[in-house]
Amino acid sequence: DKDNSQESMISSNSLSFGKNRGEAYYSSNPTFYVGIDCIIFGFNEGEISLLLLKRNFEPAMGEWSLMGGFVQNNESVDDAAKRVLHELTGLENVYMEQVGTFGAIDRDPGERVISVAYYALININEYDRKLVQKHNAYWVNMNELPPLIFDHPEMVEKARELMKQKASVEPIGFNLLPKLF
């Protein structure tokens, strides 16, 4: 019986269950960080650009990175992505789509981090320039991207492909046009 085998598997782990059986189960498993990486596309002078930051913290200080942060205890991954985008650009109510989950064991040399990547399409004329400068971020033409840290090149490529597919069937590109249109 499938249920009995699961029950015996749990009890065979010799866990001591106190008042809260789930507490012991969860405490016997590893914990790790859940990160958010935002691939922020913008339209600039007829070209698609990507908002990157030059890291001023370890690991990989001084290298190019996507904008990112960590999921907090009180938020969903979608809410965390919106918060990260807002904290770094000042923008709200921006079209964002989940790109995927990136979880290679050694993807971040600092700690074990599983990252959920999102792409955003923004009007390059509407972000908070002072906030972006504060985070040491720069717009870089997609055809001139510098080497990126960790698995960020893979995230960018996957986001680019998703954006192309979506743009061929939906009018998502309107997010990049100035309000004049």
Description of each model-found segment:
Residues 1-4, 13:
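Intrinsic-disorder-associated, low-complexity terminal segments enriched in Asp/Asn/His/Tyr and depleted
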Residues 36-38, 98, 118-120:
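A structural signal for short, well-ordered beta-strand segments
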Residues 92-100:
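A short coil-to-beta-strand element that immediately follows conserved catalytic motifs
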Residues 17-23:
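Short Pro/Gly-enriched beta-strand edge/turn motifs at strand-loop
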Residues 106-127, 159:
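Active-site-adjacent beta-strand/loop module that shapes the phosphate/pyrophosphate-binding cleft
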Residues 47-91, 170-181:
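Conserved Nudix-box catalytic region and its N-terminal flanking loop in Nudix hydrolases
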